[in-house]
């Protein structure tokens, strides 16, 4: 299984604000991995089993993970990326987890082939290789969300306190 994360650059979040609730995503620039450029629905699972579906109109849609990651690192908006793609950038502070108390459904990786009968030996070796090596690599790329998510939560609290101080002043 592959965990998806909502991520953005600290630069973008400092400028546009850190969403505290999934509904606030509609007020942000989003970049999406989708065939449908017009609409996108992100389903988030929150504390105590809450489920929220947020309809968005992404500014950019495509299937190129490295391009989307590069764009969000440069401050273009918020996107959903597989943890395996963005974990290192989150660890080193280039990206920040958005809505750290909420999660996205996990994706599942499948190897699909027509039939075992007539399966080329090279294909069988490749499938066996994936079955052996992919799960440990996925596990190694998992974020210890304790650190990264706690930093994101602290920034959300700090921005909320800053907004309260401005309102009170």
Residue ranges and their predicted role:
Residues 53-97, 104-105, 124-127:
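Hydrophobic hinge/microswitch elements
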Residues 21-23, 32-34, 51-52, 87, ...:
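Short secondary-structure boundary/capping segments
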Residues 29-48:
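Secondary-structure junction motif
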Residues 83-92, 102-169:
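C-terminal effector-binding regulatory domain of bacterial HTH transcription factors
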Residues 1-3, 7-31:
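Flexible hinge/capping segments at coil-to-helix
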Residues 9-12, 36, 47-48, 115-117:
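Short loop segments at secondary-structure junctions
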Residues 14, 37-38, 105, 119:
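Alpha-helix N-cap/loop-to-helix initiation residues
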